[in-house]
Amino acid sequence: MSSSGNPSSSSGGGGGPCGACKFLRRKCVAGCIFAPYFDSEQGAAHFAAVHKVFGASNVSKLLHHVPEHKRPDAVVSICFEAQARLRDPIYGCVSHIVSLQQQVVSLQTELSYLQAHLATLELPQPQPPQVPVSSSGSLQALSITDLPTISPSVYDLSSIFEPVMSSTWAMQQQPRPSDHLFGVPSSSNMGGGGELQALAREFIHGGQMPAQPSPGTSGSASSVIKRE
């Protein structure tokens, strides 16, 4: 099949007939509709399939209705359909179209899978939480001396002991009663200094002064103390 040619050169006067006329065993006249598209060498085999499927007269009428600049594409389509029909008499070129459509669907599925996989690779992965380097370094070098010192609470003990000490101090500041008030002789005159010390301790811890005896009863008080 030839996509170009000069009809006059394929006519009976200038050379051999075109492939279509050669197959039909007729004289190729000037202006043959098949001469530009079916050469004398390989055109006869291609035109044989076209003639068997569509018929030479039908193809001639079809090409006359097609614009001249679109005739080469029309001849290619006619030849392809004729050869497909010879290979598959039932479906013809439809089987080839279905096969191509299945390939398209398969390729689209593969493309979608690859695009989804590529999208997952482009998404930023969440970073695991990491301890700052400065914090980790300080934790590793941490020692007892680095721990914050907690100062113990300062308790004012004076508030606890002040009442007791003040009362003791007040009692100590009170003038001691002399020994002659109780009719007790001095330690130099008495050998029992322990009784006097016990009496003094009782007076200090008791916090009360014994009633002073009247001048008339000094002897009785002294006698009571001596009995004790």
UniProtKB/Swiss-Prot annotation:
Residues 214-228 have a biased composition (Polar residues). InterPro entries: LOB (IPR004883). Coiled coil: none annotated. Pfam families: LOB. Expressed in roots, stems, leaves and flowers. Expressed in vascular tissues of hypocotyls, leaves, roots, developing floral organs and siliques. PROSITE patterns: LOB (PS50891). It comes from the Eukaryota. Residues 188-228 are annotated as: Disordered. PANTHER family: LOB DOMAIN CONTAINING PROTEIN (PTHR31529), LOB DOMAIN-CONTAINING PROTEIN 30 (PTHR31529:SF4). Belongs to the LOB domain-containing protein family. This is LOB domain-containing protein 30. The gene is LBD30.
